[in-house]
Amino acid sequence: MPFDEKYFSTHTYANVTFAKYSMYWWSNRFYATLARRYGRKGARLLEVGSGMGHLIGSLEDTFETYGMDLNHWAVKQSKAVIKKTNLQTASAQELPFKDGVFNVVIIKHIVEHLPDPKKALREIGRVTEKGGTLILATPNLDSLLKPWKGDKWIGYQDPTHISLKHPDEWSYLIEKAGFDLVDIFSDGFWDVPYVRFIPKQIQKLIFGSLGGFQAVTGWVFLPYRWGESVMMIARKRK
């Protein structure tokens, strides 16, 4: 399936709202907190797969921001609302940037869509400066509650998820791309419902409270198996 306007209206994005205080608003705020924590103020930051530009736009006040996406439509939409960020259409597997120019690279829920994520991570390693930071997130095949969902697990619902891997496989590819893993954690259990006969809203409180607390506070504490996404922080070797 092509990554065009139809993709954003029929798959994961179809029911997504980025309104203030929504789940995705808090999620982007959390990623922005991580970028500011590990990045150098005023340095260049790249988001690979910037989509509609919600995350990269929130970082314009801290970094010299760059965003790229394979989706022409998404880049066009982003340009209509983001004014400072350098946005362009490009492939994650062939980044149109010089070597070692970025202090921070964010690739959030993109690698699972790529036919060759190994090549994409090598490209990210190439454009990241020595000592720079990679922030990566992808569906977590080792999630403790994934067996409860079976075939209905969120990671299986998008047919473009063609490169799902276990966290140890991702960490291996990241290290082969020239990075050292700094931290690995998760974003909590948000793929409700997990059990029958309990109202969905109650399950959000039961299962989602820890992930919500982590997102709101910016305090990273959830073990990597305690959630539907695995998140990795890595540092480019000097």
Each model region followed by its residue ranges:
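Short N-terminal helix/helix-N-cap motif within the alpha/beta-hydrolase-1
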Residues: 115-119, 146
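Conserved beta-strand signature within the Rossmann-like core of class I S-adenosyl-L-methionine
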Residues: 132-138
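Conserved N-terminal segment of class I S-adenosyl-L-methionine
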Residues: 1-98, 104-108, 121, 185, ...
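A short glycine-rich, Lys/Arg-flanked "PGG" loop and its adjoining helix->strand segment in the class I
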Residues: 118-130
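Short, glycine-/aromatic-enriched active-site segment of Class I SAM-dependent methyltransferases
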Residues: 139-161
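A C-terminal cap/extension of S-adenosyl-L-methionine-dependent methyltransferases
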Residues: 149-150, 183-238
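A short His-aromatic
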Residues: 109-113
